[in-house]
UniProtKB/Swiss-Prot annotation:
Reactions mediated catalytically: 5-amino-1-(5-phospho-D-ribosyl)imidazole-4-carboxylate + L-aspartate + ATP = (2S)-2-[5-amino-1-(5-phospho-beta-D-ribosyl)imidazole-4-carboxamido]succinate + ADP + phosphate + 2 H(+)
Organism: Pyrococcus furiosus (strain ATCC 43587 / DSM 3638 / JCM 8422 / Vc1)
Classification via CDD domains: SAICAR_synt_PurC
Name of the featured protein: Phosphoribosylaminoimidazole-succinocarboxamide synthase
Gene: purC
Lineage top rank: taxon: Archaea
Length: 234
């Protein structure tokens, strides 16, 4: 069975219904132009993702998460993946600064949901419902992904606020299971989210690497400690 490898993870077939999702220590930014390797990053992302998937499952969100296979590996359900990313934004940051006349850090009165087509070659362009239909994704499917994404946002915002963290924005991916249900997939980690400390607005995510803001592993360890309540064993 074929192993699928991306920039940050490997998907290793376990059987007809499951994959091992292995998180790598590699970090990339700006469409792969900036690259580095950080020992322990894969372990931290796997453990943080597992914690957040469990939290969401406890709140009734269907995810592909099955269990932890140890270290930097999770066991996940095999899905038919949609070729889009759903981004939810609570605070102005990143590319949103270029599209709205609002300062960085401005707290939005309501979340913004955006759709992006997954394509390295096209640099993940933003799309809308019309584009999605051309890609074979119905309006009903998009609306269900948006509904789930907003529910995820509601759960995670509250959880992170209690840990002294602002959930600035995040990216989700979805797939369809054998029952035809739309299921949350991929990962939820500091690689795919923006997290700021409530008091200092210090980044606790991949922006630390992207913009040379400090030590990436120390930022990820700090996030882990706040979420899990103990020192990471790496």
């Amino acid at each position: 069975m074929e192993i699928y490898e991306g920039k940050a993870k490997k998907m290793i077939p376990l059987d007809e219904d499951k994959f091992i999702m292995e998180f790598k220590d590699d970090a990339t930014a700006f469409d792969g132009v900036k690259k580095a390797k950080f020992v322990g990053k894969g372990w931290l992302n796997a453990q943080i993702s597992a914690k957040l998937f469990k939290l969401l499952e406890d709140h009734g969100i269907k995810t592909h998460f099955i269990g932890v296979a140890g270290g930097n590996r999770l066991i996940v359900e095999r899905l038919e993946m949609y070729p889009i990313e759903v981004v939810v934004r609570n605070v102005v940051a990143g590319s949103l600064k270029k599209r709205l006349p609002l300062p960085e850090g401005y707290e939005l009165p309501e979340p913004i949901v955006e759709l992006y087509y997954k394509s390295d070659e096209l640099h993940d362009p933003m799309i809308n419902y019309y584009h999605a239909r051309i890609l074979g994704i119905s309006e009903e499917e998009i609306k269900e992904m948006e509904r789930i994404a907003l529910k995820v946002n509601e759960i995670l915002k509250k959880f992170f606020r209690e840990k002294g963290i602002i959930l600035v924005d995040f990216k989700l991916e979805f797939g369809k299971n054998k029952k035809g249900e739309i299921v949350l997939a991929d990962e939820i980690s500091p690689d795919t989210c923006r997290f700021w400390d409530v008091e200092t607005k210090k980044s606790l995510d991949k922006d630390v690497f992207r913009f040379d803001k400090g030590d990436l592993i120390e930022a990820y360890k700090e996030l882990y400690k706040r979420l899990i309540g103990e020192e990471p064993q790496i």
